[in-house]
Amino acid sequence: MSEAGTPEGPIKKKRPPVKEEDLKGARGTLAKNQDIKSKTYQVMRDYEQAGSAAPSVFSRNRTGTETVFEKPKEGPAKSVFG
């Protein structure tokens, strides 16, 4: 049972205000000395070092070797509705 002056449950504390200069300093040091371990970033960096643009998933220039499951089919795609 609680007494008249004490609230029940956890006490919520207010966050201290954040200064703008603290944010500017933090943004600069987020990934300063860390290598990015993303496979996408690694591929992009390799293509950049080779002097060419990385292939885009939105590009229509396909060679047919992008997937190991099936080769591209000749002709338009067939409809599943008839």
Swiss-Prot record:
Q: Biological process GO annotation list?
A: chondrocyte differentiation; chondrocyte proliferation; embryonic limb morphogenesis; glucose homeostasis; muscle organ development; positive regulation of chondrocyte differentiation; positive regulation of chondrocyte proliferation; positive regulation of gene expression
Q: Which residues carry this modification: Phosphoserine?
A: 2
Annotated signal sequence is none
What InterPro entries does the annotation carry? MUSTN1 (IPR031394)
The record's Pfam families line, in alphabetical order, gives: Mustang
Motif Nuclear localization signal covers: 10-18
- PTM annotation (Phosphothreonine): residues: 6
Question: Which tissues is it found in, per the record?
Answer: Expressed in vascular smooth muscle cells (at protein level). In the embryo, expressed in areas of active chondrogenesis including limb buds, branchial arches and tail bud. Also expressed in the embryo in somites, in the perichondrium of developing ribs and intercostal muscles, and in various dorsal skeletal muscles of the back including the neck trapezius muscles. Expressed in adult skeletal muscle. Transiently increased expression in the gastrocnemius muscle 1 day after hindlimb muscle reloading following 10 days of muscle unloading.
- Location of the protein in the cell: Nucleus; Cytoplasm; Secreted, Extracellular space
Annotated Gene Ontology cellular component terms: cytoplasm; extracellular region; nucleoplasm; nucleus
Keyword Nucleus included in the entry's annotation? yes
| Alphabetical keyword list | Chondrogenesis, Cytoplasm, Myogenesis, Nucleus, Phosphoprotein, Secreted
Where is it mainly found? Answer: nucleus
Knockout or disruption consequences: In one study, knockout mice show no effect on glucose tolerance or muscle function with altered extracellular matrix composition. In another study, conditional knockdown in skeletal muscle results in increased glucose tolerance in 2-month old male mice with increased expression of Slc2a1/Glut1, Slc2a10/Glut10 and Mup1 and decreased expression of Ostn. This effect is no longer seen at 4 months and females do not show any difference.
Q: Where is this region: Disordered?
A: 1-35, 50-82
Role this protein plays: Required for chondrocyte development and proliferation. Plays a role in myoblast differentiation and fusion. Modulates skeletal muscle extracellular matrix composition. Plays a role in skeletal muscle function. Plays a role in glucose homeostasis.
The text of the family note is: Belongs to the MUSTN1 family.
Name of the protein this chain belongs to: Musculoskeletal embryonic nuclear protein 1
